[in-house]
């Protein structure tokens, strides 16, 4: 292995200086420490898997030695791009089975970009194999999976960074530091969070033969087997509860995680939710098109709402959170934030926009991926990767540590469970049980399809 420093100057030039430096300081990063060339592998070479990997390549000395995907076309296409992008120009080894990949390679870092139903098994196996893990959110499809992932990270002493990169988003770091932490909001007692994107894939595609390039059996893995009705990539798999937790698990987890970070919140004291398929009744999708949830804390309610139809309440903030204080209001999204004081005595209005780095990283724009990367998320993901590496090198925990990712993910899963059983739920994380509710407790752990075995937090 060769040794070289993380290129601090190269990174700083690419960001708006003040916000970037503020972000680095807030995240506790030290980019001047030496760092080895990390041996990296990616499991899941689709849209966000490649996007995460390429952001890491942009800012740190890494060698991508292996790629794994059950879609032969996806992994071969990704290998070609990686060979063009990484410094060595080497083509990584290709695998259709991640377990074989872990057995045959000594890896420092494994990035997991697979669908939600595979996250837990792959992350735990990667940690057992000696790798640190960067896993996309939500971390799990059920609560006990998440508990097992946290237990594994602690047992094997591995850094696990969750892809909730809003904590590494420069303008949101600025909002936390200069609005929330500065006390400009006053006493905070209510938060609204929402998503009004028309993102619920639907339709009635016919059942069809599985193409030769796709191992659909392994793609399905521990999830229930659905009849094959076309490539599940990008958004089709997200429209089924067999593989995840719908818009609640996909989009609420980001906003709720950011709010918890900004307000220093832990587990909610009680969670409730209502919703269903109220409008988009045609098609195969079985996730909600309308849902509200309440995450309760002492003297504070955090309320979520999503609709995959109609118009957003605020067209400038279709996916966002609003923190209400007695001195002012903060409304924020991945694109911008606005602080609105209640009166002149409470300060002046403040507006900040997302930071782009298209000039420094033109490949962000030209990257031949489909769909295109989220340009607004690229600077945040680079910061997030640097924080991940800093935690590895210093032996600490990253800003989006697996335990924080578990709290945010599990809270959203518990909201879906509340909707299903029709009553509020109180989760005790020490006992890993819902208080006084045997019916709901039975939902904490999904049944796995044979021969897969559900991870046990007591036996990882």
Q: Can you describe what each PLM-predicted range is?
A:
Residues 94, 119, 168-171, 381:
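Conserved donor sugar-nucleotide recognition element shared by glycan-biosynthetic enzymes
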Residues 137:
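Short basic (Lys/Arg) and small-residue
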Residues 2-132, 144-159:
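N-terminal glycine-/serine-/threonine-rich beta1-alpha1-beta2 phosphate-ribose binding loop
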Residues 83-85, 152-154, 178-181, 208-210:
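Short, hinge-like loop/turn segments at secondary-structure boundaries
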Residues 28, 174, 184-187, 192, ...:
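Contiguous beta-strand/loop segments that form the cofactor/metal-binding neighborhood of enzyme cores
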Residues 142-144, 170:
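Conserved PLP phosphate-binding loop immediately N-terminal to the Schiff-base lysine helix
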Residues 148-166, 175, 189-191:
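Rossmann-fold dehydrogenase core element
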């Amino acid at each position: 292995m060769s040794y070289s420093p993380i290129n601090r100057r190269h990174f700083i030039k690419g960001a708006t200086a003040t916000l970037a430096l503020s972000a680095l300081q807030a995240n506790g990063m030290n980019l001047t420490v030496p760092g080895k060339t990390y041996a990296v592998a990616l499991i899941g070479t689709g849209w966000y898997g490649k996007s995460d990997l390429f952001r890491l390549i942009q800012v740190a000395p890494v060698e991508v030695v292996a790629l794994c995907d059950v879609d032969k076309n996806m992994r071969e296409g990704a290998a070609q791009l990686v060979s063009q992008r990484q410094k060595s120009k080497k083509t990584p080894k290709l695998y259709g089975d991640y377990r074989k990949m872990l057995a045959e390679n000594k890896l420092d870092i494994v990035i997991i970009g697979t669908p939600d139903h595979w996250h837990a098994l792959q992350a735990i196996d990667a940690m057992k194999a000696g790798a640190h893990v960067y896993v996309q959110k939500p971390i799990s499809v059920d609560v006990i999976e998440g508990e097992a992932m946290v237990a594994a990270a602690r047992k094997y002493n591995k850094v696990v960074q969750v892809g909730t990169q809003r904590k590494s988003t420069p303008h949101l770091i600025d909002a936390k530091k200069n609005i929330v932490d500065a006390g400009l909001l006053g006493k905070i007692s209510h938060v609204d969070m929402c998503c009004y994107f028309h993102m619920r894939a639907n339709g009635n595609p016919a059942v069809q033969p599985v193409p030769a390039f796709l191992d659909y059996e392994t793609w399905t893995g521990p999830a229930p087997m659905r009849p094959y009705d076309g490539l599940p990539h990008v958004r089709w798999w997200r429209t089924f509860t067999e593989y995840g937790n719908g818009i609640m698990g996909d989009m609420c987890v980001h906003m709720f995680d950011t709010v918890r970070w900004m307000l220093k919140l832990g587990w909610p004291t009680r969670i409730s939710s209502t919703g269903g398929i109220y409008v988009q009744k045609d098609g195969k999708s079985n996730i909600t098109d309308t849902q509200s949830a309440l995450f309760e804390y002492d003297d504070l309610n955090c309320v979520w709402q999503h609709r995959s139809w109609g118009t957003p309440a605020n067209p400038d903030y279709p996916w966002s959170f609003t923190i209400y204080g007695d001195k002012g209001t903060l409304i924020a999204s991945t694109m911008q934030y606005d602080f609105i004081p209640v009166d002149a005595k409470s300060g002046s209005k403040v507006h900040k926009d997302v930071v782009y780095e298209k000039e420094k990283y033109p490949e962000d724009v030209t990257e031949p991926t489909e769909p295109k990367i989220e340009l607004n998320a690229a600077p945040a993901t680079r910061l997030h990767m640097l924080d991940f590496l800093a935690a590895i090198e210093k032996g600490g925990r990253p800003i989006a540590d697996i335990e924080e990712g578990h709290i945010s993910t599990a809270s959203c899963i518990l909201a879906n469970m509340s909707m299903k059983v029709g009553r509020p739920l109180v989760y005790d994380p020490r006992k890993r049980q819902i208080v006084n509710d045997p019916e709901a407790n039975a939902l904490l752990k999904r049944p796995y399809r044979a021969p897969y075995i559900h991870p046990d937090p007591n036996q990882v």
